Regions:
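N-terminal glycine-rich FAD/FM-binding segment characteristic of electron-transfer flavoproteins
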Residues: 1-317
């Protein structure tokens, strides 16, 4: 049977991690279909159909799909599920809200946050805050799986021409209503998809000192991250938190400043391509995953770093 991917989008555009999810889903079966649920989402459906790995797109439209409400989306997927062996979506806020409802309705065990497809029924997922990995084999006829998108490369975004089939929507779930959306506007790259992330920890000592992190991020056109300790101390808002209970990031460059490296934080960033750590404690766990480490007082090292960055006129923004 085929694989069904639940595409994440904002009606006009596909969310970037959808391309990573397509790569993961295609490794389970080459007959990959994708469903897109929304309102006036024709443009996103067309872009989905252009992904070479997608063989068919199912488009479901209604006004009550304008905004994501898991109680409205889940019945659509459950109805389609009879034709598929695997139901896939990303292990982010979207997937963590949606997939448990689908799995419960299908009476199947969910396999969460996989980082590798070993075979069509066996997957690898992290446990113990990423310090160990467990292969999981599912014998369920219907497999509900969430994937860690940062563990898979994005697929090619053009060259495909999958047919688009429109399907009738399910009725609106009246016990849950979308109230409002609150978005934080920023000119910075999004933390979850940024090429460069500069993060600060409790070693910053205050919210005012986080201006040093901002200065470095400005020079590198980077996203700003933080450890949970920095967030709990009130130095920065929790939407910047990186780690097991925050965002998982895999940038090309991750700069950790004043972060000791608790296992919960390492779980969210240790797969970064290059890791640079700056900490005055030479025994800090962050150095165990760092490609480059500087044992120094950050309040001396970072101003010098900023000064050197100011001298470089070749940095592209």
């Amino acid at each position: 049977m085929s694989v069904l991917l639940v595409a994440e989008h904002i009606n006009k555009e596909l969310k970037p991690f959808t391309l990573n999810a397509v790569t993961a889903a295609s490794q389970m079966d080459t007959d990959l279909h994708a469903v897109i649920i929304g309102n006036n989402c024709g443009d996103a459906a067309k872009k989905l159909s252009e992904l070479p790995l997608v063989k068919k797109v199912i488009q479901v439209e209604a006004t009550h799909y304008e905004n994501f409400v898991a109680e409205n989306f889940a019945p659509v997927i459950v109805k389609l599920a009879e034709n598929y062996s695997h139901i896939i979506c990303s292990a982010n806020t979207f997937g963590k809200n949606l997939m448990p409802r689908i799995a419960a309705s299908l009476d199947t065990s969910q396999v969460s946050d996989i980082i590798k497809v070993i075979s069509a029924d066996t997957f690898l997922r992290p446990i113990y805050a990423g310090h160990a990995f467990a292969p999981v084999k599912s014998k369920d006829p219907k497999k509900c799986i969430t994937i860690r998108p940062t563990s898979f490369d994005p697929c090619e975004s053009s060259g495909g021409s999958a047919p688009i089939e429109k399907v009738e929507p399910s009725e609106e779930f009246n016990n849950t209503k979308f109230v409002r959306r609150e978005e934080i506007k920023s000119d910075r790259p999004e933390l979850g998809t940024a090429r460069i992330v500069v993060s600060g920890g409790r070693g910053m000592q205050s919210g005012d000192n986080f201006k040093l992190i901002t200065s470095v991020a400005d020079k590198l056109n980077a996203a700003i991250g933080a450890s949970r300790a920095a967030v709990d101390a009130g130095y920065i808002s929790n939407d910047h938190q990186v780690g097991q209970t925050g965002k998982v990031v895999v940038p090309d460059l991750y700069i950790a400043i004043g972060i000791s490296g608790a296992i919960q934080h390492l779980a969210g960033m240790k797969e970064s391509k290059v890791i640079v750590a700056i900490n005055k404690d030479g025994e800090a766990p962050i150095f165990s995953v760092a490609d480059y480490g500087l044992e120094a007082d950050l309040f001396e090292a970072i101003p010098q770093f900023i000064e050197e960055l100011n001298k470089l006129n070749t940095i592209q923004k």
